[in-house]
Amino acid sequence: GVFNKEGKIQTPHLDHMARQGMIFTDAHTSSAVCTPTRYGILTGRYNWRTPLKRGVLSGTSQALIPPNRTTVASFLKYNGYQTAFIGKWHLGWDWALKDSAFQNKPVRNQEIFDKIDFTKKITNSPNGLGFDYAYGHCGSLDMPPYVYVENEKITAQVENITERKGDYHWWRKGPTANDFDHERVTPHLFDKAEAYVSEMNEKGKPFFLYLPLPSPHTPILPTEEWKGKSGLNPYADFVMQIDHRVGRLNKLLDELGISDNTIVIFTSDNGCSPEAKFEVL
C-alpha cells in the first residue's frame, strides 16, 4: 500500500484516496488507543486534560466529555451543518440506573449490568455534544453491553447474554440486544452511513458525518464473503472488507455528484492489534 510498500494486505480504495489526496506521514499521539484518540479528534485537546490519563473507558463508563465542551460537531452545527455520529463511541455516556444511589459512582464491574435500566434514555450522550443524529454502541465490540443506541434510546430489547472466546473472535460476556449481531456490525454501520449521506444530499443540506468504526479492532470478524480473501489471516480479511466499504462510500459521493465538495478524512485510532499476528502481514 501507499503507506507500507512491504505490506501484504490489498487496500486499493484506501491507496486511491491517498494518491488522490493528502497524506500525513509524520503524525504523533500522546496515547495511541481508542478513547484518548477519539477525544482528541472531537475536541482538539490533549487526552491528559481529562480525568483519564491513560488507557481506555469501558462500555459502562460515564461520559468523559462534559456537555459544555466544544466539539467539531457542535462547532459545525453552529455554522449550519447537519451533524451525525454513526459507529463506535467509546467516550462514555451515562446509562440510566435502576437505583439512583449508584448514579454518580464509577460503573466498571460486571454487576453494574443488573443495575442498568435499558428502558430509559442515556444522558450525557453524543446528541448533547453537537450531533443532531447519533447511532452506535458504547465501546469496543468486545465490551458489553452490546446494544445499539439511537438518539439516546436503545433500538431493541436486551434479551441475551453472549460471550465468545478464541484468538481472533473473542468478546467479553455481557447483555446483548436481539438486533445486535457482532459479525454484521461493521457492514451495518456502513449501510447507515450511506443512508445518511443519501438523505442529506436529497435534502440539500451541508453535513458532517463522524464514522468511527469498531473494526479492525477485536473481535476480528470478517463477514463470510471476505473470509480467506487476503490469503493471510482473518485480520487481513477484515481490513480488506473495510477498504471495500470505504471505496463504496466514496463511490456514492461520486454518484451523488458531491465528491468535489466533500472532504473525506480516514485515520486510525490505534496501532496494529496484537491479535492481528502482524508478523505475517
Placement of each model-derived feature along the sequence:
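Formylglycine-dependent sulfatase
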Residues: G1-L281
